[in-house]
């Protein structure tokens, strides 16, 4: 029986005999189509921007082999990928040799690197993708000597290097090369590295396999396909499309999955079922559900606060016959926010309205829940995150929440920090104290348990309101903590309620981070948050009073600057949280606490009184 790798190689040879190129995502017909479309509709700003970026590259020196943080060549790898893809497209679009000639300079520099830094294999994989695209798209322009040099570099720096990963089984970890870092192939279920590394190496194989004497090609394709096939089915939840690493890493992982799948399609005529997965098809709607009315995502874990409407929406539109996703991406393109990946996938087709999105997202046993008052641009939107703290790219953030009124985010997730911090898990943004949740006895030692996890226990939504409840006790040893979020649509309010069992001497701190201007009433029971005239009314419905750390949320944190270590006497500073205030409530002296805090959008309507019910009676 033929292996999947053998099938891919045979199909590619049949479709592209006599070393025919281009065959990686872009074909001759695709480049011709873009030349014809260059002045039309949304194609014009997208393609004009791509050529303008290529023009900027012409006078730049080629990238050097530099590892500025001592860990990653990744900045160079990504720059090479960006440069080569832009230059290649500009050459096809204009026919001007200056773009191809400048690409040759970049290729020559890259193939002469001492290696492609397999110790941090993402660096190697992204360079494999970059050089594969350039070799394929410029095949008829490159000299025979340079093509031979490219093939040799890919074999040495890519194929031989990846076999160290594929051959090094867990029981022999680091035997072959003890200097390797993260063992992404052995890691199960793993993370975005599987898409990037397997995808980059597959592109490299497809670019050169028919011109080399190398018995590794089939082996690499076999390992890459099997590993990625499994990862797709674990990373993209079958029920609702939730991506396991959150909204930020969805784009990175799916970008390389799209390269992998589309490269197989144009080379071999099929991706052999790699992306035939309903969870992947549903994943753009996970992003839409996890974003505010202006498409800014809920950036829990290692993510930044940014728009979720990436170029991969266009790939999903084509792959899963969902043209409504093109329209979402088109808005960004018309605003001048295109990316080179748009060139690969975007189609300016007649707009199809997005299917009606539910006003709530979640279910029992899910990691996240979101609610909104309506589908309008000025709607109130709130989201809450549970999940496993030690998930890939997770933080100690169980129970954290965000809240928007329209485009204004009143309660924020501070997002990721510098991965080179030592220890990263000790930085403010990683710890529970840097999130919108509760902690007991604030100190460097006391936070949420790293190994803890939970999912939604109860989820409900109807016309007027919706709620999600989860038991977070696993995060707090020897304590019990249950948190609920309820959004009430008629009153435009969000209730965060915690029910806690603890020790009498425990100090509980409830916190939420905000960029708003905050005014606390004299009695401390209410506060008004103001963002450029849009106001949110906060009220404590139970014990406690509001306090605030103004303008610098982490000011009283004992871990804002990690202590230097002998191996790193000058650690990188943590990111600046200037301009973010921490609104908090401190409670102590009892074994049982109920903390109910309601946030209501301030309008001309009178704010109705609230009733506090035990979470067990929410229905």
Stretches with model-predicted labels:
Residues 64-71, 132-246, 344-356:
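Active-site lining segments of carbohydrate-active enzymes
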Residues 417-619:
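CBM-like, beta-strand-rich accessory domains located in the C-terminal region of large
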Residues 2-68:
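Low-complexity, Ser/Thr/Pro/Gly-enriched N-terminal "stalk/linker" regions
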Residues 182, 208, 248-411, 461-464, ...:
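Carbohydrate-active enzyme catalytic cores, enriched for enzymes
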Residues 21-40, 81-97, 109-117, 127-146, ...:
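Well-ordered alpha-helical scaffold segments within catalytic/enzyme domains
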């Amino acid at each position: 029986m033929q292996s999947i790798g053998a099938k891919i190689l045979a199909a590619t040879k049949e479709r592209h005999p006599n070393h025919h190129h281009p065959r990686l995502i872009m074909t001759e017909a695709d480049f011709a189509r873009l030349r014809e479309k260059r002045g039309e509709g949304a194609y014009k700003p997208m393609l004009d921007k791509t050529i303008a970026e290529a023009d900027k590259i012409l006078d730049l020196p080629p990238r050097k082999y530099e590892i500025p943080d001592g860990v990653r060549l990744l900045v160079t790898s990504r720059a090479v990928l960006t440069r080569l893809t832009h230059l290649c497209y500009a050459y096809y679009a204009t026919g001007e040799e200056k773009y191809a000639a400048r690409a040759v300079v970049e290729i020559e520099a890259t193939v002469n690197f001492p290696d492609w830094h397999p110790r941090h294999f993402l660096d190697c994989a992204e360079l494999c993708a970059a050089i594969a695209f350039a070799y394929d798209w410029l095949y008829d322009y490159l000299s025979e000597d340079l093509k031979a040099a490219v093939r040799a570099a890919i074999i040495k720096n890519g194929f031989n290097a990846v076999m160290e990963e594929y051959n090094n089984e867990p029981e022999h970890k680091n035997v072959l090369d003890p200097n390797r870092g993260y063992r992404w192939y052995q890691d199960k279920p793993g993370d975005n590295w599987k898409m990037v590394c397997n995808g980059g190496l597959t592109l490299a194989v497809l670019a050169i396999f028919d011109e080399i004497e190398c018995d590794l090609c089939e082996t690499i394709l076999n390992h890459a396909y099997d590993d990625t096939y499994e990862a797709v089915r674990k990373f993209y939840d079958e029920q609702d499309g939730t991506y396991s690493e959150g909204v930020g890493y969805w784009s990175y992982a799916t970008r390389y999955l799209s390269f992998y799948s589309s490269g197989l399609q144009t080379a071999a005529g099929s991706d052999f079922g790699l992306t035939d997965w309903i969870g992947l098809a549903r994943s753009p709607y996970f992003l839409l559900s996890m974003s505010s009315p202006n498409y800014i995502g809920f950036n829990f874990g290692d993510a930044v606060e940014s728009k979720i409407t990436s170029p991969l929406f266009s790939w999903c539109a084509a792959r899963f016959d969902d043209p409504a996703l093109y329209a979402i991406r088109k808005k960004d393109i018309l605003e001048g926010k295109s990316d080179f990946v748009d060139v690969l996938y975007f189609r300016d087709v007649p707009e199809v309205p997005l299917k009606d999105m539910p006003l709530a997202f979640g279910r029992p046993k899910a990691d996240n829940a979101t609610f909104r008052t309506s589908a309008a641009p000025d709607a109130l939107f709130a989201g809450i995150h549970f999940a496993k703290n030690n998930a890939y790219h997770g933080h100690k953030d169980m129970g954290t929440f965000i809240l928007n009124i329209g485009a204004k985010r009143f309660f924020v997730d501070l997002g990721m920090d510098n991965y080179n911090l030592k220890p990263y898990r000790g930085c403010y943004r990683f710890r529970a104290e840097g999130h919108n949740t509760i902690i007991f006895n604030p100190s460097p030692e006391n936070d949420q348990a790293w190994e803890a996890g939970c999912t939604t226990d109860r989820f409900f939504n109807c016309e007027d309101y919706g709620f999600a409840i989860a038991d977070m006790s696993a995060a707090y040893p020897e304590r019990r903590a249950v948190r609920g979020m309820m959004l009430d649509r008629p009153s435009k309010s969000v209730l965060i309620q915690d029910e806690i069992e603890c020790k009498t001497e425990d100090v509980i701190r409830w916190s939420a981070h905000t960029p708003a201007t905050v005014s606390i009433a004299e009695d401390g029971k209410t506060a008004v948050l103001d963002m450029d005239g849009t106001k949110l009314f906060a009220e404590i419905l139970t014990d406690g009073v509001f306090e605030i750390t103004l303008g610098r949320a982490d000011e009283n944190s004992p871990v804002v600057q990690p202590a230097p270590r002998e191996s790193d006497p000058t650690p990188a500073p943590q990111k600046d949280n200037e301009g973010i205030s921490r609104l908090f409530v401190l409670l102590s002296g009892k074994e049982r606490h109920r903390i109910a805090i309601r946030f209501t959008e301030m309008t001309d309507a009178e704010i109705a009184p609230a009733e506090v019910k035990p979470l067990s009676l929410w229905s």
